[in-house]
Amino acid sequence: MLQRTLAKSISVTGVGLHSGERVALTLHPAPENSGISFRRTDLDGEMGEQIKLTPYLINDTRLSSTIVTDKGVRVGTIEHIMSALSAYGIDNALIELNAPEIPIMDGSSLPFIYLLQDAGVVDQKAQKRFLKILKPVEIKEAGKWVRFTPYDGFKVTLTIEFDHPAFNRSSPTFEIDFAGKSYIDEIARARTFGFMHEVEMMRAHNLGLGGNLNNAIVIDDTDVLNPEGLRYPDEFVRHKILDAIGDLYIVGHPIVGAFEGYKSGHAINNALLRAVLADETAYDRVEFADSDDLPDAFHELNIRNCG
């Protein structure tokens, strides 16, 4: 299977979830083996240089997965666009933006899916590399845990826990094996969510200024405030899976393995990536030149060429 990039550059504007400011974002094709990179067009000199994404650049995970370079350049809320790039198997792209955070759009990854569909996807000459999990790796902290286990495909199982009536109406656990299920159908539409009391607290600290009922599920003491309700009965846990897929794709390769988590979040997801990369016996970088050897979970990438 070959690496892929965008067929053409494409732009979109939106609002930053935390700044509330307008953000102009452009995705560009990139050369093979270059990976996913970001560039802040509003910064000059060294501050405006291209940033090659790695798990070691995620240095702020308080509210999202945020790049913070050693020069202090920030690119926040990257998990939704990374999740969409993962769904289309984009190995190489340059993402330019004129603000410190990716626009929140509607709170899901679906607008970025549409953006990729409009841009089109093209195969490149180099072979795609996958990160194959060879042995179990687990991180536990403060009542939360995440783990990778070997698996011939890509499967995600997550459980959330919130003592709240809105969450008690659906299962707290969702499992998706991408050998038989579609990311676009099952995951992409799930929106980020937050509690009204948290929104008020964040705004008191000049955060969450761009959040509203058009780009997030907002919950009061008893119920969902969005008049249209939920897009899936279990939209909350599905969004956590959307986030996790984006967080994991920061490693730069599709993962051949199973990911499980209980009360997972950006910090512990990133810690798991770092733990895997720190143990050379835990993973291998593999290629599938023969499509017959490709795990079923990735066959959809072979036919999803929207160019």
Curated annotation (Swiss-Prot):
Its cofactor is Zn(2+). Keywords: Hydrolase, Lipid A biosynthesis, Lipid biosynthesis, Lipid metabolism, Metal-binding, Zinc. The keyword Metal-binding applies. One of its GO terms (cellular component) is membrane. Its EC number is 3.5.1.108. Signal peptide: none annotated. Belongs to the LpxC family. Catalyzes the hydrolysis of UDP-3-O-myristoyl-N-acetylglucosamine to form UDP-3-O-myristoylglucosamine and acetate, the committed step in lipid A biosynthesis. This is UDP-3-O-acyl-N-acetylglucosamine deacetylase. It comes from Neisseria meningitidis serogroup C / serotype 2a (strain ATCC 700532 / DSM 15464 / FAM18). The gene is lpxC.
